């Protein structure tokens, strides 16, 4: 259960991960670690003008953090650790501080970074987690607003307004505070992704289908409904390369059950309308000559997102290459359960409205 905004909790490491370094935990015992969730909800319910099955995304008009709308928190001039999960249906958050304070990014949804990464802002998709430290002793003011400027839907939707551009306020107490905590220069070094380990290369295409009036009615992965027979059957313990081809207008956070992966690069798709037309006809990236279209500009993965993750943002009109491990990343040990047992697993978009509209495919494993 997430701590309330005024509850003090001890610094703990994410479940399943060993301590961050032999030098000790990221923050010394006694420091504050406050798990947070950010979501957006309507203050007043509205009678839907469109059937929920065809509601592409839901955006509320109140930003809620740990059950409170636009809360505030009183902090001392010292380091605090926050674990933030984006629990919104569909809203992306691009977090930044109004007074210019930075974030020291130490981990994500699956693992620690190899080294702490200093960032002034960061983008968090639905279901993504950021593990970070904020040092309020660096503040040049007595308050700081955790702000958001991500359009909705992301990335080409409406700009934020006065209400949803603010997440919460930090009131920074005056006076010097003794802070003996240290942030290690090295956290955890996991095995580096090795393309030569990949036994299979897959192409996964994301589609959006619209009505005659241009309204989105359903979203498919690989042009198939969830009920269609399984087509992805990885071997337990294997490594694969997945090329995610996003043919929609939205950024889709992709989550793979039992898989941990590293985002390698994102390549722009040129002449995407022509490529999409071919893909919707035959749904075969090779036959549609994907290499002919995936030759635009490349987007480098941000330094704080180069580690192992279980969800990642798939940019629209780009092909994102990821290396997926279907095993533990810190060892070659197999799962302590039968991953081949029924009913199997899934991979899906983690925008809740897309997921509930079965932008999802079955995933079965074999030995």
Predicted stretch roles:
Residues 99-103, 149-154, 174, 242, ...:
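Short edge-strand/loop segments of extracellular domains
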Residues 98-112, 247-302, 328, 353, ...:
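Active/binding-pocket-proximal capping segment
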Residues 140-171, 341-342, 346-358:
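Terminal connector regions
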Residues 87-89, 136-139, 151-152, 246-249, ...:
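Short, charged beta-turn/beta-strand-edge "cap" motif at the junction between a beta-strand
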Residues 195, 201-263, 308-330, 334-348:
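C-terminal substrate/ligand-recognition segments
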Residues 92-95, 128, 132-133, 140-152, ...:
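Ordered core of a single globular domain
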Residues 82, 132, 146, 242-244, ...:
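A generic structural signal for residues embedded in beta-strands
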Residues 1-125, 129-135, 154, 163-212, ...:
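Histidine-centered copper-binding motifs that mark active-site loops
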């Amino acid at each position: 259960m997430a701590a309330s905004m005024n509850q003090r909790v001890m610094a703990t490491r994410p479940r399943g991960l060993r301590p961050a370094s032999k030098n000790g935990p990221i923050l010394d015992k006694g420091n504050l670690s406050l798990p947070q969730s950010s979501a957006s909800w309507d203050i007043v319910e509205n009678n839907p003008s469109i059937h929920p099955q065809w509601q592409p995304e839901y955006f509320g008009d109140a930003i809620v953090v740990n059950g409170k709308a636009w809360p505030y928190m009183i902090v001392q001039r010292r380091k605090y650790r926050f674990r933030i999960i984006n629990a919104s249906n569909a809203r992306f958050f691009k977090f930044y501080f109004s007074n210019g304070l930075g974030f020291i990014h130490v981990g994500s949804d699956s693992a620690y970074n190899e080294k702490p990464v200093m960032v002034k802002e960061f983008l968090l998709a639905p279901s993504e987690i950021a593990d970070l430290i904020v040092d309020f002793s660096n503040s040049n003011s007595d308050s700081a607003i955790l702000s958001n400027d991500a359009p909705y839907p992301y990335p080409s939707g409406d700009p934020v307004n006065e209400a949803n551009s603010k997440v919460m306020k930090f009131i920074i107490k005056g006076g010097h505070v003794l802070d003996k905590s240290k942030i290690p220069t090295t956290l955890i070094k996991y095995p580096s992704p090795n393309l030569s380990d990949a036994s299979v290369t897959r192409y996964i295409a994301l589609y959006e289908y619209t009505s005659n009036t241009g309204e989105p009615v359903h979203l498919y992965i690989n042009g198939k409904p969830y009920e269609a027979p399984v087509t992805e059957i990885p071997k337990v313990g294997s490594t694969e390369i997945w090329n995610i081809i996003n043919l929609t207008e939205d950024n889709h956070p992709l989550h793979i059950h039992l898989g941990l992966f590293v985002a390698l690069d994102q390549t722009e798709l040129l002449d995407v309308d022509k490529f999409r037309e071919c893909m919707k006809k035959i749904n075969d990236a090779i036959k549609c000559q994907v290499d002919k279209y995936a030759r635009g500009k490349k987007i480098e993965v941000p330094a704080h997102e180069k580690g192992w993750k279980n969800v990642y943002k798939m940019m629209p009109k780009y092909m994102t290459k990821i290396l997926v491990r279907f095993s533990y990343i810190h060892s070659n040990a197999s799962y302590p359960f039968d991953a081949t047992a029924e009913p199997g697993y899934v991979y899906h978009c983690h925008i809740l409205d897309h997921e509930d509209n079965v932008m999802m495919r079955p995933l079965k494993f074999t030995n």
